[in-house]
């Protein structure tokens, strides 16, 4: 009987051991599954964070590019402002300059009038020198080809000695500041 008892005990031990092994395997499978789920969740979180990082980096690069563009635009505006700073003053002085030219076109035999005209001519020349220092130039007209960018045709002429579209007379001087027209020349153009 003791042999039977031993056999039963051994069988019970084996069954118990097998049950324990099955339980251990089940626990390991559950742990592996939980670990796999955790890894999958962690990987998903990592991907999400990487995507957010990429998005933030892209926004940063765009903002940096926008800042550089604003900086360049500001520099260009400042340069243009500096370049054309005297335009408003020149526009205000042009009517006075025209009046000087009309006054200087008069002639007189009186010595006093000649002296006054000489003084006016000196002032006129000083204004032209100041204009030149600022980059303000007279737009060439008589003998030039008509250019609507620089000239305003107010009359037509039929001169056989002049070419087609050639300016035959200047009625009012035009001026430009560097590359910008302040006032176009008013001209008479040959047909």
Curated annotation (Swiss-Prot):
Q: Which domain of life is it from?
A: Bacteria
Name of the gene encoding the protein in the UniProt record: grpE
**Upper taxonomic lineage:** Bacteria, Bacillati, Bacillota, Bacilli, Bacillales
**What's a Pfam family this protein contains?**
GrpE
One of the protein's GO biological processes? protein folding
Predominant localisation class: cytoplasm
HAMAP family in the cross-refs:
GrpE
Classification via CDD domains? GrpE
Name the UniProt record assigns to this protein: Protein GrpE
Keywords attached to this Swiss-Prot or TrEMBL record, sorted alphabetically, are: Chaperone, Cytoplasm, Stress response
Question: What is the protein's known function?
Answer: Participates actively in the response to hyperosmotic and heat shock by preventing the aggregation of stress-denatured proteins, in association with DnaK and GrpE. It is the nucleotide exchange factor for DnaK and may function as a thermosensor. Unfolded proteins bind initially to DnaJ; upon interaction with the DnaJ-bound protein, DnaK hydrolyzes its bound ATP, resulting in the formation of a stable complex. GrpE releases ADP from DnaK; ATP binding to DnaK triggers the release of the substrate protein, thus completing the reaction cycle.
């Amino acid at each position: 009987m003791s042999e039977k008892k031993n056999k039963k005990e051994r069988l019970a031990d084996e069954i118990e051991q097998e049950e324990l092994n099955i339980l251990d395997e089940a626990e390991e499978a559950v742990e592996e599954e939980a670990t796999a789920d955790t890894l999958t969740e962690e990987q998903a979180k990592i991907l999400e964070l990487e995507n957010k990082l990429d998005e933030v980096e892209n926004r940063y690069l765009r903002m940096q590019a926008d800042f550089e563009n604003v900086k360049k635009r500001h520099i260009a505006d400042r340069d243009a402002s500096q370049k054309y700073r005297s335009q408003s003053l020149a526009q205000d002085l042009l009517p006075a300059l025209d009046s000087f030219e009309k006054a200087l076109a008069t002639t007189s035999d009186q010595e006093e009038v000649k002296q006054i005209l000489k003084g006016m001519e000196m002032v006129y020349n000083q204004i032209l020198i100041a204009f030149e220092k600022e980059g303000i130039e007279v737009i060439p007209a008589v003998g030039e080809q008509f250019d609507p960018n620089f000239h305003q045709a107010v009359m037509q002429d039929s001169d056989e000695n002049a070419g087609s579209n050639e300016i035959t007379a200047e009625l009012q001087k035009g001026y430009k500041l560097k590359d910008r027209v302040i006032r176009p020349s008013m001209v008479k153009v040959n047909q």
